[in-house]
UniProtKB/Swiss-Prot annotation:
Component of the ubiquinol-cytochrome c reductase complex (complex III or cytochrome b-c1 complex) that is part of the mitochondrial respiratory chain. The b-c1 complex mediates electron transfer from ubiquinol to cytochrome c. Contributes to the generation of a proton gradient across the mitochondrial membrane that is then used for ATP synthesis. The lineage of its organism: Eukaryota, Metazoa, Chordata, Craniata, Vertebrata. This is Cytochrome b. Belongs to the cytochrome b family. The gene is MT-CYB. CDD domains: cytochrome_b_C (cd00290), Cytochrome_b_N (cd00284). It comes from Abrothrix longipilis. Heme b b562 binds at residues 83, 182.
Length: 381
């Protein structure tokens, strides 16, 4: 008698994805972050659903409804802070996941990589519209500043901004539609995640050695289910430490002041996970140029498979590229720091240098390092 999970039409799909999936025997803990992102997405959808039951998307009551959730709803404070800090954990896992993809050359699985870029963009969009919903000062002004960037588009810009706002300023219509977007986008993300997995399972996972692992595969369950479970426990532990001890450490104090169109906060800035892109945007004096740089800061990831000319897969045996990679990571951290600083000397100059370096490493320095390393290989043999 055949096992049901191998014959049942629905269970068969789950079986081929999570149970009998042939997996390289040597993938390290850096490969745990895919499953952690799945857990984060589930946490966000569940907590978000319960928040939506009590939230009202009206400018008069939005701020009060969030306060009501925290004060009057059973464990409302827990759900709210799990959702807010869950987003931060989501982005930490996302950045590590992308970083691992760059380090180990996983971008050569180009369909999976490109769907991943779409996922990153969609997640950032979801986080942005979600940040507007509590209708605090930073919510309102963040929405005003970021949506206003679209006015830089020639000819149709102003019309486009007013169309998104649903009026002549960020107001009730904007909040209502942002709530609608914030509700639907996670389900679109879930659909893209399934496509991401579909493409991944067409080729199989990459592995730290960068070699073909077809000759040495093991079933996903029980080996990697147990391994992923450790990651999940650690993730939940860090999340709960954040939620229960430091719930506001990653937030902005300005968001505890209700939105006031007549009073601009001293420093308008988005959540920490969008700061690197915000720093790149601010470092260009021209408005349209800044918007293009902002979009390119994410889309540049699509250039990795195109610019790669290395004879080796991944950076594990490539010291020059490795050095550049860690400079790139440090540069990203500097950009994140600069994005949260006021627009004044010396922060502006540091931001401009870091922005130039961000693009230069990917477009100029990495390909050049590839060529040098290929030549060193020729000398060796």
């Amino acid at each position: 008698m055949t096992i049901m999970r191998k014959t049942h039409p629905l269970l068969k799909i789950i079986n081929h994805s999570f149970i009998d999936l042939p997996t390289p025997s040597n993938i390290s803990s850096w490969w745990n972050f895919g499953s952690l992102l799945g857990i984060c997405l589930i946490i966000q959808i569940l907590t978000g659903l319960f928040l939506a039951m009590h939230y009202t998307s009206d400018t008069a009551t939005a701020f009060s409804s969030v306060t009501h959730i925290c004060r009057d709803v059973n464990y409302g404070w827990l759900i709210r802070y799990m959702h807010a800090n869950g987003a931060s954990m989501f982005f930490i896992c996302l950045f590590i996941h992308v970083g691992r993809g760059i380090y180990y050359g996983s971008y050569m699985l180009s369909e999976t990589w490109n769907i991943g870029i779409i996922l990153l963009l969609t997640t950032m969009a979801t986080a942005f519209v979600g940040y507007v919903l509590p209708w605090g000062q930073m919510s309102f002004w963040g929405a005003t500043v970021i949506t206003n960037l679209l006015s830089a588009i020639p000819y149709i810009g102003t019309t486009l901004v007013e169309w998104i706002w649903g009026g002549f300023s960020v107001d009730k219509a904007t909040l209502t539609r942002f709530f609608a977007f914030h509700f639907i986008l996670p389900f679109i993300i879930t659909a893209f995640v399934l496509v991401h997995l579909l493409f991944l399972h067409e080729t199989g996972s990459n592995n730290p050695s960068g070699l073909n692992s077809n000759s040495d595969k093991i079933p996903f369950h029980p080996y990697y289910t147990i391994k992923d479970l450790l990651g999940v426990i650690l993730l939940l532990m860090v999340l709960m430490i954040l939620v229960l001890f430091f719930p506001d450490v990653l937030g902005d104090p300005d968001n505890y002041t209700p939105a006031n169109p007549l009073n601009t906060p001293a420093h308008i800035k988005p959540e920490w996970y969008x700061l690197f892109a915000y720093a790149i945007l601010r470092s260009i004096p021209n408005k349209l140029g800044g918007v293009l740089a902002l979009i390119l800061s994410i889309l540049i990831l699509a250039a990795f498979p195109l610019l790669n000319s290395s004879k080796q897969h991944g950076l594990i045996y490539r010291p020059i590229s490795q050095t550049l990679y860690w400079i790139f990571v440090s540069n990203l951290l500097i950009l994140t720091w600069i994005g949260g600083q006021p627009v004044e000397y010396p922060f502006t100059v540091i931001g401009q240098i870091a922005s130039i370096l961000y693009f230069a490493i990917i477009i100029i320095l990495m390909p050049x390092a590839n060529m040098i390393e290929n030549n060193i290989l020729k000398l060796x043999y």
